[in-house]
Amino acid sequence: MAQIDFRKKINWHRRYRSPQGVKTEHEILRIFESDRGRIINSPAIRRLQQKTQVFPLERNAAVRTRLTHSMEVQQVGRYIAKEILSRLKELKLLEAYGLDELTGPFESIVEMSCLMHDIGNPPFGHFGEAAINDWFRQRLHPEDAESQPLTDDRCSVAALRLRDGEEPLNELRRKIRQDLCHFEGNAQGIRLVHTLMRMNLTWAQVGGILKYTRPAWWRGETPETHHYLMKKPGYYLSEEAYIARLRKELNLALYSRFPLTWIMEAADDISYCVADLEDAVEKRIFTVEQLYHHLHEAWGQHEKGSLFSLVVENAWEKSRSNSLSRSTEDQFFMYLRVNTLNKLVPYAAQRFIDNLPAIFAGTFNHALLEDASECSDLLKLYKNVAVKHVFSHPDVEQLELQGYRVISGLLEIYRPLLSLSLSDFTELVEKERVKRFPIESRLFHKLSTRHRLAYVEAVSKLPSDSPEFPLWEYYYRCRLLQDYISGMTDLYAWDEYRRLMAVEQ
């Protein structure tokens, strides 16, 4: 196992800046303060205020959006980071681990990773993801790319259909089809930060949001040693070279994770579990009393002094005894949140320290709060009650189905841009309006300038005389559409769909 030295991981250099010499502690902290400013002032963060947490298109400002959720995750991440650093200081290990002059950057990277962790999520959350992937899967049929004979290939895009005698090109076709059918919010977050918004963050800060290490074009089983880390796609083919450079800059082995990402993940797990239940009470899906009984029933028999007793029962009893000063709802969730944090944050911090050799190497194949402990059981309790009584509620399911339809419908509306031939689409990009393509011209004008420029830049770097050019061009054209639609807020997607379907009120 390599020696633990965080100076080798907290890399404060940037992709688009020439290498700099040795910096003082204050100068390094200023570099990460610059990251904070870039992130907090970015449009991607502002858009989170109109993206779904659990309840799409919610008008009640007391119910969480992705932005308010991310701010809560940021606070919990800071708490865990400080707890880790405090414990390492008590153990006199800060200097040994190269952290004595990097405590500020350590905290800042965790905080900003937490704030950014959802920026790649499309409108309507996981149902938006599913809509994008299903729509592309129905047209590209990535499963047919493994089939024999090649005549069984149902891919509707001629450039991406497998052909006899073109094995090197066929392998690229397989990768592209697989990649486009695995849109994922975390992978889109990497693309946003690097390719679309050109935020030019430090290598360490970007490493903090690389939650999953599986390429989106991966086919087959994942290695048992990395099955958790590769649970979902973490980056796209379009960012392959950038991630390879990121791994080099952060001393990460293939499919390994940046150490501070485990803290961001734990902060997210702690935050959303309680928040989803609180939002459900705010939405009157159930009362606080009903929630307590759901939790009690799901946990089962317990003794005085058990974690359930110390966290949930304690919150319930205190909220009932102090009901004159504040509402029972407010009291209950205040105590539940405080009790949960007071138990889970120290536990997550100690798990991080206990497993630091594997975490530093990037190979710890678990979440900090997923083990056989009571703390893990408490998180599972919150999640299970939310799944059973919140996510399955008819109002929630109806909104999710509407969201799925909106995203599918928008993709269908913009499909003419994907149906154009390479030469016709190239003409449209160059002229912006082509008389014989009136619909396509108007659809193209609606695309964001940022996304169009990203497409143009990517295609301009390709050798136009290469047999791979038509494949890559179509890939980036699909990315253009995915970038545009996934970047919409819930409300904008809803309004855009209604406008283009001519059903605006």
From Swiss-Prot:
Entry's Gene Ontology molecular function annotations: dGTPase activity; magnesium ion binding
Domain of life of the organism encoding this protein: Bacteria
Gene3D superfamilies named in the record: Hypothetical protein af1432, putative deoxyguanosinetriphosphate triphosphohydrolase like domain
Family matches, as Pfam families: HD (PF01966)
EC number(s) given by UniProt: 3.1.5.1
HAMAP family: dGTPase_type1
Stated name of the protein: Deoxyguanosinetriphosphate triphosphohydrolase
Record organism: Escherichia coli O9:H4 (strain HS)
